[in-house]
Amino acid sequence: EYGHKPILLIGGATGMIGDPSGKSKERNLLSESDISHNVEKIKNQVSKFLDFKKQKNPALILNNHDWIGKLNIIDFFRDYGKTLTVNYMMSKESVKKRISLGQSDGMSFTEFTYQLFQAYDFYHLMKNYDCKIQMGGSDQWGNITSGIELIRKKTGQKSFAITCPLITKSDGSKFGKTEDGNVWLDRNKTSPYKFYQYWLNSSDEDSESYIKIFTMADKKFIDSLILEHKSKPHERILQKFIASELTKMVHSEEDLESVIKASEIFFGKSTFSDLEEIKEDVFLDIFEDVPSVKISKNERSEEHTSELQSPV
């Protein structure tokens, strides 16, 4: 909207190596088929947030397997491996932290080379797409600045890094696809109902942070909503706004209406017609954690017949 061309880079190649940043042990390596599957899923998910089809300045989605997969290892180490020294690479926090763990839980050569491949990504994007700014989470600072250094040494040009803090909860734990208690954009992994409930059950402290990070509301509105919430926290005004906005953004208006009705059913605030209209998958989500027993249809039918035949 402001003239920049966003490029979403998917790590089809680097995903096979595993980024050591922020990890105390080596990641489990994914197979090529698993990564291809994930790439397609990610493309579908981000299409809700970035427009790849608009005529003016469309976003671009790229997979680094398209260029890294074609590299000859000897040529790569000769042309790019000589550019970054081992001293420079070992100065990165992610490397120092892993090496300090000792020999048993140290860093493999595979993981050590990760930053060189990510640096090459930045160089490739600048050379072929005039990309001069790379954005990412704060744990990617070392990898991104390695790219800046590679670009400087290979071309003499300036490039830039922008990172944002990793999102953490009030208890210090972080969001992440490999963390416990995570929430997914894919409705098959986190249903719209559970997605809505996740935000609805957020703490007051977390919600004050989430509304600033995840919604497009302006500062004046956010400040007034926080004040209103603090005056009657039992109504969970802040949580309801965040849950509604994010469910609409990630899923749809229809899904939002459905999960709100589902919540009303659970707390006995609905009509019989609401119960008839609700989708089966949403209904099952509501009562997933509610104590229940299963009765077969045949067993219930036999019981009913027995009641009819009983003498008055």
Which residues does each PLM region occupy?
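Short glycine/serine/threonine-rich phosphate/pyrophosphate-binding segments
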Residues: 142-144
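NTP-dependent nucleotidyl-transfer catalytic core
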Residues: 1-138, 148, 155-160, 173
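Conserved nucleotide- and phosphate/pyrophosphate-binding catalytic cores
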Residues: 154-306, 310
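Generic structural microfeature
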Residues: 37, 56-57, 139, 167, ...
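Generic alpha-helical propensity signal that fires on short helical segments
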Residues: 22-28, 77-79, 85-86, 140, ...
